[in-house]
UniProtKB/Swiss-Prot annotation:
Full protein name: Translation initiation factor IF-2
Bias (Basic residues): 207-219
Region of interest called G5, as start-end residue ranges on this chain: 490-492
GO molecular function, one term: GTPase activity
Swiss-Prot/TrEMBL keywords: Cytoplasm, GTP-binding, Initiation factor, Nucleotide-binding, Protein biosynthesis
Keyword field contains Metal-binding: no
Region (G1): 354-361
Location in or out of the cell: Cytoplasm
HAMAP family listed in its UniProt record: IF_2_B
Residues covered by region (Disordered): 199-219
Region (G2): 379-383
Region (G4): 454-457
Superkingdom, taxonomy of origin: Bacteria
Length: 846
């Protein structure tokens, strides 16, 4: 017998190496690893031990076979091997054992394949004939027999099939083999019949479900079979039910696959809110608020952000950005291609500026030969007038601006839309504050100046004084080597007016003013108002192109179709060229003075662009209010008391006047009293204005307008007072007085008398009594006092007693002696002064 290793023996006997080593050790054969060899003597000893102990080795193998539907079967194969041989046949049996085991495994695998072909087995079948054969074989001891107790098949639900298949062996008789084959055939024929019956029942159930309108049976998801395996089987090993079937449990996924961060491209536009930015980046708004907080900005999810802040947030969170061009629509609509048109020379647009009452409108009146000043309240121009004047040498368009300081913005607007500025300075007054402002506006707009020294006909006129004062402000005349023309004029007599017009036309020739006379018109809104029966009326100065009746126009946030046009004389016209002032009707609302006017071919685009501009204005207003709230929060820290507010509802005749008054009133606000214009508009005072005034306790002010009948009745019922004004001086002065009335009175101390201590007496009742002489004013018994020593206050209190000789006195006048007892103070010395004062209320003024 050749030597064999432990590993080879374990492989032949289908045993684990460790288990075989333990078994060898129990038999007294010491081996430590699978590479150790077994000698023939050790092999003989091993076989003797096995035969003497009649050792039995049992192995079990479980396999799973899937069936259709929701079921599967478990096939359990058990092998028992008992060796009972005669001593002389042990060696040969041991050598043949691996071959017998291999044959047995092949037979079992064939049987398992047959079982896998069966879809379902629901009952236990026992092979009685195989058991009888087994008993016969156990009785035969003479021949070595390796018995296989067979395999057991466990199906779901808990259906078991046990069958015993005997292994082929050289010592088995032919009758035993035939009996074994018959038993195996019988077992599997019964299994096939059972499976066929089960399939027939399943088909009947499916057909019934289809007839009943049901969906029938669904094929089970392979992923669900493992979940259902433990829940569907509720039978014991004898086939009895243990309980009701449980519903399949939904198992939670224990591991979430990590997702790679997505880098998004965010489109950022001006005024984007925190919530919109969060939505574009697919994050929560709270995360962006945290980022802003870390950047030192306190914000809410509805707050608007500027583009720079939004860019920082997007970069901080690891995304990319693109800037949204908000002006794309505006550029596409408003930019007009005029390359195919020719330019022509146009009339100059001249703005007359100067101080109030220096004769601007009178000069223009003389030029136009009309009495415009007679129609102005108080002789003061309240809003811009646009006029076109034809002279022998050409046409000139004049813009007359107010001279009052309240109309600074209107003067600036006139300077922006003008070519030449005529600066009117009175020869008797010289340079005044509004004159300096007019110079600043003209220089800021880089507009050439022509100085008209007016009122030259007066005896006190001094033109040299005017020239020297203007030279100090860098307005150098040509006679001094500068570039500014000075013309002495008189609006009353007409002296020098022709020379002034000639100087203006000469300056316009130097400028070479040109414009396009064809194409879509462009211009600027000079003034706007709301007229009863006509609607919104806008005074427009055409700068380029040809404005025609019926054109679709866009003025700021208002749009419409030109229904009618009137020139400066009130006549209807069909078209207007460059440098022509016209009044137009047909806008959707009253535009703001200074807005650009453009003609757009498509009315739909004009409406869309107007809505976009309106939205921009709202967002800008909200952003400004937010910044003001933040600044006010820090400015009001530590301030005591509440700020008084004077609420005003302002109505005017024209847009420019309302705007100027609004700015002037807002400038009156102080830390203690604030002017709040809660509503302003153009046109008559209506009942809605009265209702708003009642709700907000506001004052209603009308400038060159009156209340309608419905508003008057409602005002009488609710007790609302209207204040009408025609001159802006009176309006501002009255508002100042009203604001002063809201101021809390100021408390001031006033010294009413001083008494000098000449001698000190002692009294058992009052303590120290000062004998005094009143040297100033009067000393009163009830007023507070201060004790001064060397002009330093050492005590402040009240008088306990005041006597003249032995009698009590309520007051002692200057030059008289008296006795004064100071309450709770006895350290009065000779030479001290007792100062008597009183606290009075003084009304504050702005």
């Amino acid at each position: 017998m050749a030597e064999i290793t432990v590993g080879q023996l374990a492989q032949q006997t289908n045993k684990e190496v460790d288990a075989l080593l333990k078994q060898l050790k129990s038999f007294g054969i010491e081996k430590s690893s699978e590479k150790d060899t077994l000698t023939p003597t050790e092999m003989k000893t091993l076989l003797e031990k096995i035969n003497s102990a009649k050792n039995t080795a049992t192995r079990k193998k479980v396999t799973s076979v899937k069936l259709d539907g929701k079921h599967k079967i478990n096939v359990s194969v058990k092998r028992k091997r008992r060796v009972a041989k005669k001593m002389e046949q042990q060696e040969s049996t041991t050598l043949e054992q691996p071959q017998e085991l291999e044959t047995m495994v092949q037979e079992v695998s064939q049987q398992v394949d047959i079982v896998k072909e069966q879809d379902n087995i629901e009952q236990i079948v026992e092979n009685k004939e195989a058991v009888k054969v087994q008993e016969q074989r156990q009785a035969e001891i003479a021949k070595p027999v390796i018995k296989d107790s067979g395999f057991k098949i466990t199906a779901m639900p808990e259906i078991k099939i046990e069958e015993i298949v005997a292994e082929d062996d050289e010592g088995l008789a032919a009758s035993d083999k035939q009996a074994k084959k018959k038993a195996a055939k019988k077992v599997f024929s019964e299994a096939v019949n059972t499976n066929t019956k089960y399939k027939r029942e399943e088909e009947e159930k499916k057909s019934k479900a289809k007839k009943a309108g049901g969906k029938g049976f669904k094929k089970a998801n392979p992923r669900q079979l493992s979940q259902l395996a433990g829940d569907l089987e509720s039978f014991d090993e004898f086939g009895a039910k243990k309980g009701k079937l449980k519903a399949p449990k939904v198992k939670k996924q224990e591991f979430t696959k990590p997702v790679e961060n997505t880098v998004r491209t965010v489109e950022i536009y001006e005024g984007i809110t925190v919530s919109e930015l969060a939505q574009k980046m697919a994050v929560k708004g709270a995360e962006i608020v945290k980022v802003l907080f870390n950047m030192g900005v306190m914000a809410t999810i509805n707050q608007s952000l500027d583009q720079d802040t939004a860019i920082l947030i997007v970069e901080e969170m690891g995304h990319k950005y693109t800037l949204h061009n908000e002006n794309a629509l505006e550029e596409a609509v408003t930019i007009v291609d005029r390359s195919s048109y020719k330019k022509i020379s146009r009339a100059p647009v001249v703005t007359i500026m100067g101080h109030v009452d220096h004769g601007k409108t009178s000069l223009l009146d003389y030029i136009r030969q009309t009495r415009v000043v007679a129609g102005e309240a108080g002789g003061i121009t309240q809003h811009i007038g646009a006029y076109s004047v034809k002279t022998d040498k050409g046409s000139i368009t004049f813009l007359d601006t107010p001279g009052h300081e309240a109309f600074t913005s209107m003067r600036a607007r006139g300077a922006k839309s003008t070519d030449i500025v005529i600066l009117v300075v009175a020869a008797d007054d010289g340079v005044m504050p509004q004159t300096e402002e007019a110079i600043q506006h003209a220089k800021a707009a880089r507009v050439p100046i022509v100085v008209a020294v007016n009122k030259i006909d007066k005896p006190e006129a001094d033109s040299d004084k005017v020239i020297s004062e203007l030279a100090q402000r860098n307005v150098i005349p040509e006679s001094w080597g500068g570039d500014v023309m000075f013309v002495n004029v008189s609006a009353k007599t007409g002296e020098g007016v022709a020379d002034l017009l000639e100087a203006v036309l000469l300056q316009s020739e130097v400028l070479e003013l040109e414009a396009f006379a064809e194409g879509l018109a462009e211009g600027v809104v000079i003034e706007s108002r709301l007229e009863k029966g006509r609607g919104p009326v806008a005074t427009v100065l055409v700068q380029n192109g040809n404005l025609k009746q019926g054109d679709n126009i866009l003025c700021g946030t208002e749009y419409g179709r030109v229904r009618a046009m009137h020139n400066d004389l009130g006549k209807k016209i069909k078209a207007a060229g460059p440098a022509t002032p016209v009044e137009i009707l047909g806008l959707s609302g009253v535009p703001a003075a200074g807005d650009e006017m453009v003609v757009i071919e498509n009315e739909k685009k004009a409406k869309e662009l107007a809505a976009q501009r309106s939205q921009k204005q709202k967002e800008a207003k909200i952003a400004q209010e937010q910044s003001l709230k933040l600044s006010n929060m820090f400015n009001n820290m530590g301030k005591e008391g509440e700020q008084q507010v004077l609420k005003i509802i302002l109505k005017g005749d024209v847009q420019g006047s309302v705007e100027a008054i609004r700015e002037s009133l807002l400038k009156l606000s102080t830390d203690e009293v604030k002017v709040d214009i809660i509503a302003s508009g153009i046109g008559a005072i209506t009942s809605s204005d009265v209702t708003l005034a009642v709700a907000s306790t506001a004052v209603v002010i009308g400038f060159n307008v009156r209340a309608d009948s419905a508003a008057k009745k409602l005002a009488e019922t609710d007790g609302v007072e209207f204040r009408y004004y025609n001159i802006i001086y009176d309006l501002i002065d009255d508002v100042k007085k009203a604001m002063s009335g809201l101021l809390s009175p100021e408390m001031k101390e006033q010294i009413i008398g001083i008494a000098e201590v000449r001698e000190v007496y002692r009294s058992s009742k009052f303590g120290s009594i000062a004998g005094c002489m009143v040297i100033e004013g009067v000393v009163k018994r009830t007023n507070p006092i201060r004790v001064l020593r060397n002009n330093v206050v050492i005590y402040e209190g009240t008088l306990e007693s005041l006597k003249r000789f032995k009698d009590d006195a309520s007051e002692v006048k200057k030059g008289l002696e008296c006795g004064i007892g100071v309450k709770n103070y006895n350290d009065v010395r000779e030479g001290d002064q007792i100062e008597v004062f009183e606290v009075i209320e003084v009304a504050k003024e702005l």
